[in-house]
């Protein structure tokens, strides 16, 4: 077998052990190098699977009781502009997207790739959005909670219990609050991905409305280019006027 053919063969996730045994006898350096690379990839995949299954430890306790579990997370607490977005996701027990993890650990491209897969494989997905005006009226913490409530109530299937990332959702459901829950629960991690991609899409839309603020790059966070635009043009209608330094600029001309 030619080395290029062996290279293509070793791209598979699972290979007949008999074939691997035969390749191990091949003394060509190129073949042995490919085998080493394959083994490393397999070890990495095994570790990824182990960690993925470990992030279902909370869900498994409830699944064993026949309960549906909803993971809840939010994104957008810290930005100076735009809404806070929450998502609630109910995953099936056979969910197997190994790359699902805390959205902050994933590249934008990976989040975008996982987003439609989560929507397709989840039992139910709900999204909640609280805009900057609500945030200014009731504060970011309470707006967070309302967005989470809206997300849970938007689920087409009612969960029996919620796993929430360090918050309490104002709904009549049993809840388990997990510190850094998006790194401990796949349900919360899936919700974090949905919320992040959904909010980023909204901020891309706002970037077209207010091109001077580069919302498609900074997502409303206080980056250097964002702060420079604020000083030059003043706040837009989507800025959080109670957030510093926007609050100090309220007297400036607002962008139309």
Curated annotation (Swiss-Prot):
Domain RNase H type-2: 67-255
EC top class named in words: hydrolase
EC number(s) stated in the UniProt entry for this protein: 3.1.26.4
GO cellular component: cytoplasm; ribonuclease H2 complex
Pfam family, one: RNase_HII
Location of the protein in the cell: Cytoplasm
Cofactor stoichiometry and binding remark: Manganese or magnesium. Binds 1 divalent metal ion per monomer in the absence of substrate. May bind a second metal ion after substrate binding.
Binding residue positions for a divalent metal cation: 73-74, 165
Disulfide feature: none
Record keywords: Cytoplasm, Endonuclease, Hydrolase, Manganese, Metal-binding, Nuclease
Top-level taxon of origin: Bacteria
UniProt cross-references to InterPro entries, sorted A to Z: RNase_HII (IPR022898), RNase_HII/HIII (IPR001352), RNase_HII/HIII_dom (IPR024567), RNaseH-like_sf (IPR012337), RNaseH_sf (IPR036397)
Reactions mediated catalytically: Endonucleolytic cleavage to 5'-phosphomonoester
Single GO biological process annotation from the record: DNA replication, removal of RNA primer
Molecular function via GO: manganese ion binding; RNA binding; RNA-DNA hybrid ribonuclease activity
Cofactor(s) the record lists: Mn(2+); Mg(2+)
Protein's job: Endonuclease that specifically degrades the RNA of RNA-DNA hybrids.
Record-linked NCBIfam families: PRK00015.1-1 (NF000594), PRK00015.1-3 (NF000595)
UniProt similarity note: Belongs to the RNase HII family.
PANTHER family: RIBONUCLEASE H2 SUBUNIT A (PTHR10954), RIBONUCLEASE HII (PTHR10954:SF18)
Protein name, entry field: Ribonuclease HII
Species of the source: Lactobacillus delbrueckii subsp. bulgaricus (strain ATCC BAA-365 / Lb-18)
Gene name tied to this protein: rnhB
């Amino acid at each position: 077998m030619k080395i290029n053919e062996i290279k293509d063969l070793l791209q598979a996730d699972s290979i007949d052990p008999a074939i691997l045994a035969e390749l191990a006898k091949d003394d060509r350096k190129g073949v042995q190098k490919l085998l080493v690379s394959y083994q490393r990839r397999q070890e990495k995949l095994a570790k990824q699977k182990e960690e993925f299954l470990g992030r279902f430890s909370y869900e498994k306790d409830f699944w064993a009781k026949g309960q549906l579990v909803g993971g809840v997370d939010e994104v957008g607490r810290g930005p100076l502009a735009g809404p806070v977005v929450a998502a609630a996701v109910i995953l099936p027990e056979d969910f197997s997207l190994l790359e699902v993890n805390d959205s902050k650990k994933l590249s934008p491209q990976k989040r975008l790739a996982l987003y439609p897969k989560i929507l397709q494989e989840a039992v139910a997905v709900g999204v909640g959005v609280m805009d900057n005006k609500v945030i200014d009226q009731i504060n970011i913490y309470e707006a967070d909670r309302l967005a989470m409530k809206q997300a849970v109530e938007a689920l087409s299937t009612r969960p029996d219990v919620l796993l929430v990332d360090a918050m309490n959702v104002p709904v009549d459901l049993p809840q388990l609050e997990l510190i850094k829950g998006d790194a401990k629960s796949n349900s919360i991690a899936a919700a974090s991905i949905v919320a992040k991609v959904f909010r980023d899409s909204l901020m891309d839309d706002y970037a077209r409305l207010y091109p001077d603020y580069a919302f498609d790059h900074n997502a409303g966070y206080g980056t250097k280019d964002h702060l420079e635009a604020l000083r030059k043009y003043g706040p837009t209608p989507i800025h959080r006027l109670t957030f510093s330094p926007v609050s100090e600029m309220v007297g400036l001309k607002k962008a139309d």
